[in-house]
């Protein structure tokens, strides 16, 4: 892990290359924010339990893999990605896959 003041960077395998990613968490005075939830974050459930807000860069599997570990956290995503984050059907529609 790298620390820069209140910013923690948890390095995934292969320096964060796909599919592991790197987990960035910013600890503020009132809120703890995670940027994306890559595979690397699945090994840091202790940290994820502290997260209040998740900001998703976009809805690819390597950015949302550990989102299920933070049901307590609010999630922010681009307006065009919201349906894909909310349900499996929304994700299928987002990527043009046949509905389940």
Regions found by a protein language model. Give the residues of each.
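Conserved beta-strand hairpin/beta-sheet module of binuclear metal-dependent hydrolase folds
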Residues: 1-46
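Active-site HxH/HxHxD metal-binding segment of metal-dependent hydrolases
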Residues: 20, 42-100
